[in-house]
Amino acid sequence: PSMLFSTVPSTLFSTVPSTLFSTVPSTLFSTVSSVIQYSIHVIQYSTLHVIQYSTLHVIQYSTLHVIQYSTLNVIQYSTLHVIQYSTLHVIQYSILHVIQYSIHVIQYSIHVTQYSILHVIQYSIHVIQYSIHVIQYSTHVIQYSIHVIQYSIHVIQYSILHVIQYSIHVIQYSIHVIQYSTHVIQYSIHVIQYSILHVIQYSILHVIQYSILHVIQYSIHVIQYSIHVIQYSIHVIQYSIHVIQYSILHVIQYSIHVIQYSIHVIQYSIHVIQYSILHVIQYSILHVIQYSIHVIQYSIHVIQYSIHVIQYSILHVIQYSIHVIQYSIHVIQYSIHVIQYSIHVIQYSIHVIQYSILHVIQYSIHVIQYSIHVIQYSIHVIQYSIHVIQYSILHVIQYSILHVIQYSIHVIQYSILHVIQYSIHVIQYSIHVIQYSILHVIQYSIHVIQYSILHVIQYSIHVIQYSIHVIQYSILHVIQYSIHVIQYSILHVIQYSIHVIQYSILHVMILACSM
């Protein structure tokens, strides 16, 4: 600084004692030797006084001034600059970058979750539409089978009517038997139609609708709960980020105090205060680190609990789906039993018809031979119709109902399994994304902390080196200035001594002349 050596006191060479020449004895200038002795005395006194004053006073003043100015100003400037640069810029940059990265990670997780939920819903809708299409196709098959049965009944009715028209005056009893058998067949067909329609409506439509609706509702609840767990994990991450920021701030404050302590080692008088501050910071940082570890452990426990809840919910969905499938299988088995019972009724009706026709033929064989031929022909028609009915019913039952039920069960199992597997993959991927984001944020925070601490340490080392350079330069300048002052003082003393000697000689000569 330009003002360092401009404050030399103006009284440095004006403090020569006023009694220096007032205490000269009257007999001092009686001889030349006394004048020389007095001059030597003046030179010794002035030289000693100037050297002591200039050397000690100037060195003490300049050294103290340089140390105070360089130490205080450099420490204040370097500390303030380090605090402003490292604390504000590093913290602003690290917090801004971490917040931006966390926002991007959270937005990506939300996008993945929305896409997975939308994909599951679309796939479930496609499965439901395909199941409805299969059910509609099965309904068309059953309707076609009903039309075949109605046509067979129409053929039977027409053949029976034709036989009755040709043998109406011969066998009235057979007409009653055939009418009764026709009513039995119609009732059996009605039972079959009712049982088939009821089984299809109840077992396929209601069970599939109930199971799919319940699975979708439960999957939506599981997904909502997973979203709630993800939101809670995000809150835990935000709280961890807050704790990390708080710990970073305390680490930076601790680094600043360590730098102040390393700089203020020169001043021994405040060593105790720095040691107490260091002890308090170490104690607070230890507790902050322990608290951060506790928060991280708690967040890990929360994530483990979320995984446990997701596993339990998935297991509950699988168990409930298995229960629904078992109940559907029981309903299908009951429907098969009803169909088998209807088949037995039809077979019994056919047996009654055959027995009644045979009995009528035996009672009327010697009365109407032509009627026998007609009846035989009608019997063949009826047998053929019965065979067609049996074949159509068995074929419809075996092909349409059984295959449709098996295919529907297969589609339901495949859709439920695919939805569960896809949900598990989505949940695993979400957990992986969350774990990766947490790990990446922690690693990036550690990297930012390490980089900021390293930058602060490097900057502090540069400040200390600059302070040492300033102190060395100040001491060198003080030494040069002291040498210059000493040289100037010696020159001034010599000039002043010569002036005193000249004045003394002149005074002696004047005294000698007057004597």
Curated annotation (Swiss-Prot):
UniProt keyword Cytoplasm present: yes
Keywords, alphabetical: Cell projection, Cilium, Cytoplasm, Cytoskeleton, Dynein, Flagellum, Microtubule, Motor protein, Repeat
Name the UniProt record assigns to this protein: Dynein heavy chain
Complex formation: Consists of at least two heavy chains and a number of intermediate and low mass polypeptides.
One of the record's GO cellular component terms: cytoplasm
Described function: Force generating protein of eukaryotic cilia and flagella. Produces force towards the minus ends of microtubules. Dynein has ATPase activity.
Keyword Repeat set for record: yes
Cell location: Cytoplasm, Cytoskeleton, Cilium axoneme; Cytoplasm, Cytoskeleton, Flagellum axoneme
Region 68 X 7 AA tandem repeats of [IL]-H-V-I-Q-Y-S, residue ranges: 35-508
Source superkingdom: Eukaryota
Repeat positions for Sequence: 4-11, 12-19, 20-27
Family under the similarity heading: Belongs to the dynein heavy chain family.
UniProt repeat feature Incomplete, residue ranges: 28-32
Major place of residence: cytoplasm
